[in-house]
Regions:
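Condensing-enzyme catalytic core mediating Claisen C-C bond formation in acyl metabolism
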Residues: 1-61, 173, 178-219
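Conserved catalytic cysteine-centered active-site region
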Residues: 39-65, 98-156
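Buried hydrophobic packing segments
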Residues: 68-75, 141-148, 188
Length: 219
C-alpha cells in the first residue's frame, strides 16, 4: 500500500514581534556578564546573520495544543475527511503546554489527547500520543505514521508539530530572538498508486551528548 499526504494545515499566530521589541532587553554572556555592544548593534548583527526581522508569538490565551488544533482543523478540511476517520494522532513537541507567564510545561493529558478532545472525536480507536524527539520530531512522526500504514495498523494518520518556544527561552539570551511559535499538521493516508518514503534515517546520540539540552533549575 502506498501513502500520500492528502491534506496540510498550519497556524501562524497573530502577535507580530519585530526585532526592535528586543532593544530594551538585558542580554548577557554565558558567564552572566553584560555584552559590551549595544542592543542596537546586537540586533543588527543578528538580522545580518539570520535574515530574521520579525517573528510570531501565540496570544496569551493560547497554548501549543490550541495552535495544533487550529492547524489540524485546516489539514482535515484540506483533505476533505472527517476527524472520526483518523486512526492515529501523533503530536511532536518538546515542552508541552506552557501557559503565558509560566515556564512550567504541562503534558498530562497528552497534547495529542487534547487535540482529539478539541476535534470532538468520539471514536476510542483513534489513538492519540505525543512524540518528544527534539527538532526533527515531526519528521519522526511521519516515519511512524508511514510504518503504521505500511503494516496495515492504520489507514489515516494526523501528524502534528507545534511549539510555543517564546515561553521557554531565556530572556537574557540573545539567541531567544531566533525562536517563535506556531503549528503545522498533515493528513497521511493509504492510497493505491501514490508514493513512498524512499529512505529515512533516525538516530539518538546519548553518550556525552545526552545532556546538551536540559531544563534549568527551579527556584
Amino acid at each position: 500500500m502506498s501513502i500520500a499526504i492528502t491534506g496540510t494545515g498550519c497556524y501562524i499566530p497573530e502577535v507580530l514581534v519585530p526585532n526592535k521589541a528586543f532593544e530594551d532587553k538585558h542580554f548577557l554572556n554565558s558567564d552572566g556578564s553584560t555584552f559590551q555592544q549595544s542592543n542596537t548593534v546586537i540586533i543588527e548583527k543578528f538580522k545580518a546573520i539570520t535574515g530574521i526581522s520579525e517573528r510570531r508569538y501565540a496570544k496569551k490565551e493560547y497554548n501549543a495544543s490550541d495552535l495544533a488544533f487550529f492547524a489540524s482543523q485546516n489539514a482535515l478540511e484540506d483533505a476533505n475527511i472527517s476527524a472520526e476517520d483518523l486512526d492515529y494522532i501523533i503530536f511532536a513537541h518538546n515542552f508541552g503546554d506552557v501557559s503565558y507567564g509560566s515556564s512550567q510545561g504541562n503534558t498530562l493529558p497528552s497534547l495529542a489527547t487534547r487535540v482529539k478532545n478539541h476535534l470532538q472525536i468520539k471514536n476510542p480507536k483513534c489513538v492519540a500520543y505525543d512524540l518528544l524527539f527534539g527538532c526533527p520530531g515531526w519528521i519522526e512522526g511521519m516515519i511512524q505514521a508511514y510504518a503504521f500504514i505500511k503494516s496495515g495498523m492504520a489507514r489515516r494518520c494526523l501528524v502534528i508539530g507545534a511549539e510555543t518556544l517564546s515561553r521557554v527561552v531565556d530572556p537574557h539570551d540573545r539567541d531567544s530572538m531566533i525562536y517563535s511559535d506556531g503549528a503545522g499538521a498533515c493528513i497521511v493516508e493509504a492510497k493505491e498508486g501514490a508514493g513512498e518514503i524512499l529512505a529515512h534515517n533516525s538516530a539518538t546520540y546519548a553518550n556525552e551528548e545526552a545532556y546538551y539540552l536540559f531544563h534549568g533549575s527551579s527556584y
